[in-house]
Amino acid sequence: EAMPVTTGLVLREPDGAVVADAANGYITYVDPTTDRSGANGKIFVGAAFPAQVKEAKVVLLSEKEKKDRGGADGHVLAISEYEPGSEYTYYWGSAWDKAAIKTQDAWNKYMAEYAQKLRTPLAVAY
């Protein structure tokens, strides 16, 4: 019997920098790093799923939970159906805004395209 399985990313100071897109099969988050001045840049993180994601959402922690978890504010989650005995696959990745991917929009576009490629792989016929 199928059961839910969850993949998630820890959020610190999410402030709108989170995408939970079940329909397109990816979740993303922009982490501000530890330097509040921005000198260290931002880290983009995400997960893409080749199979259908049933639900994707942000879950924020209560103030007490935040203290107990050392600064985490919550999670962005992708919930899928898992059939025991089968494989569960997802792809996790990251980028840095001081390298090739400079903006949150560029990161989200990259992840959306990557998830689309996972879901519709190249088919070669001869």
Walk through the language-model features, giving the residues of each.
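A recognition module on extended beta-rich or small alphabeta surfaces enriched in W/G with H and D/E
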Residues: 25-56
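Beta-strand-rich recognition/accessory modules
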Residues: 55-126
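Generic structural hydrophobic/aromatic packing signal, biased to beta-strands
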Residues: 7-9, 29, 45, 90-92
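A short, structured loop/turn motif at beta-sheet edges
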Residues: 2-3, 37-38, 51-54, 81-87
